Amino acid sequence: HGGVINGIYQTPGKRSPNWDKGVLFEGMFNRWVVNRIIEKLDRKKIPYYHISPEFTDTTLETRTNRANHIFDQNPDVWILSIHANAGGGTGIEGFTTLGQKTSDGIGDLVLRNLKDDMIGTSMRFDWSDGDRDKEKDYYILKRPMAPAFLIECGFMDHPIDYNNLWDEIYIDTLVDSLVRSIIEVYNI
């Protein structure tokens, strides 16, 4: 999702209600998390690829094409897609595509670490197929050649999650957990 350019949010919808901290734009939140992950990976000298660095709303097709080009050159990569949710729920949830794939193991590791690290945060697990993730054929999960995992870091339209998504400690803990998972996936 897009960021804020000259005070204008680049993606229709994808925002919280205008509560006490103001409107939380999903694209803005996503960038907070991704940029902190990038900083930590840089400091640890861990290589990564960023398939959506623009502040404009980059299409799913463009992001997928970029990911597929990277995968052609480096088939060891996987996709971590960061989001903030909406729809009246609460908590963290993660998604992989339908069926048992490499992404299920990655997603289960990420969600296990988040459960351990995000003390007191509701986790929305789906154990119906033996792992924690939910399965949906979202474009960014189904179309790339690389394994892909999508994480929803909380619900922008739930008061507790809204406050968490603005909270520095919550974001730092989330980022530390995601970086730990990246390191574990790559066995670094």
Residue ranges and their predicted role:
Residues H1-V23:
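Short glycine-rich His-centered loop
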Residues L24-I188:
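Active-site-proximal helix/loop segments of hydrolytic enzymes
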